[in-house]
Design a protein with these regions (language model features):
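Short S/T/G/P-rich N-terminal loop/turn motif that feeds into the first structured element of a domain
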Residues: 1-56, 64-74, 97-100
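C-terminal structural segments of small proteins and small subunits
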Residues: 66-94
Length: 100
């Protein structure tokens, strides 16, 4: 099993209301991948960080294998969510992948 954890910072020019809407859209889009991407075991997006956080949201996923994670990265459904709901609104992305 492989964990794939992403932290994002949203663009500064977004208002608080826009950030809330973007976070909700990202959560809906990414959690909606459950059952649609082979090898994706679990997916959770946390959008309610404490004020002390330096990231705005976190993706926490579990995959059957490193190969499943690699396939996910180019899966058309994932790419559509990333291109439509994530990349246009984020300024920074941090990733940690590890075996469990």
């Amino acid at each position: 099993m492989v964990k794939h954890v992403i932290l994002w910072q949203l663009k500064d020019e977004l208002s608080d209301a826009e950030k809330a809407a973007v976070k909700a859209g990202i959560k809906e889009g990414l959690e909606g991948l459950a059952g649609k991407v082979p090898g994706l075991v679990e997916v959770h997006v946390n959008i309610n960080g404490l004020p002390s956080s330096t990231a705005d949201l976190m993706l926490d996923t579990t995959f059957e294998s490193a190969e499943a994670l690699k396939a996910y990265s180019v899966h058309p459904t994932h790419v559509a969510v990333a291109d439509g709901k994530v990349r246009p609104y984020t300024k920074a992305r941090f990733c940690l992948d590890y075996e469990i």
